[in-house]
Amino acid sequence: MKNKRDRLFFTLLFVPQAPQSSYDRRAELEVLLAIPSAQSACGMEITMTDRHPYYEFEKDTYEIDEFDCSSIFLFVGKERALLLDTGCGIGDLKGVIRKITDKPYIVIASHGHMDHIGGAGAFDELYINPADNYFLDVSFEKMLENRRNYADFIRKREDKYYPYSTENDMLCWEKKPKLLPLSDGQTFDLGRRIITAYSCPGHTPGEMVFIDSKTRYLFCADACNRNLLLMQSGDHTEGRYVSVEKAAKAMERIVSMKDQYDHVINSHHDYRGFGAPLADYVVDQALECMKKIVDGTAEIREIPDPLQLNATKTVAVYGDVFITYSKEGVYETR
């Protein structure tokens, strides 16, 4: 072939089509051969995908699906917008936001896991609970490796075609955003719409949840789900560990705020419909499950591990909720 572009075009034409694709094949090639935006391995520039599905499930309230890796939420007010989480950092998230609004926006992390802050390198500033700042201390190269590994795992687990490549659409950060402190009770006025942040340690030490005054939704990120993982692999002395006892108290406070919200939506739509809330009872069942772990009466069961292929894990179960924790991490250190 004459040059690198010819070779790339030939390669793209003969990429085998994955079965059960929900995307149009012609659109796939259009994305891969689109206008310049990122540097490819062969030296030519290609566009990063902005084909993230998104859905306006309430007025000016959008769930952006990062190809089943995580959900990103965008709230649009009269004066500005707020972006909750940045996913793993697949493709051109800024381009997706531009499709929805031209208003200036704030960027907030619900917590520090890489499937929620992986795209933060594209932004200048990031609000995050300081208790989770340490998640961003890893090198850019190691973070990129972790992000790509997670995205590849989701692709294998779901057995779907997604319109992105980890090589061209998941790039190393060029800079770290300025970290701004996010605290319990902090409010963000978007113009006739206020988002309030609340601390809810459990999944991570700095996990935050958010109540939207306009929709009366509680956005609980990873603080609550039918598949709840508690942060129990860290060192007690470094503040990187959350006991079940502490997580239960935090969840109990959020449950006590039910007069402020009507629906709950989390940051992965594995156990709910895309753009749809969690079942109303999930928060209550999660709290009850934690309480039973603490008092020693929880039902223990072995289930398939959704975060590993062909593996199982031991969990506590109550109703439709199962919680992953360690026996050593039930109680606060006295």
Locate predicted features.
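Accessory terminal helices/loops
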Residues: 13-14, 21-44, 249-334
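Short glycine/proline-enriched coil/turn segments at helix->beta-strand junctions
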Residues: 78-79, 101-104, 120-125, 213-215, ...
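Active-site HxH/HxHxD metal-binding segment of metal-dependent hydrolases
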Residues: 90-187, 226, 277-302
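Conserved beta-strand hairpin/beta-sheet module of binuclear metal-dependent hydrolase folds
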Residues: 50-99, 210-225
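Hydrophobic/aromatic beta-strand patches that form the interior of the parallel beta-sheet core
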Residues: 62, 106-108, 127, 180-182, ...
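Metallo-beta-lactamase
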Residues: 33, 37-44, 49-56, 81, 89, 131-201, ...
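Intrinsically disordered, low-complexity segments enriched in serine/proline and basic residues
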Residues: 1, 5-15
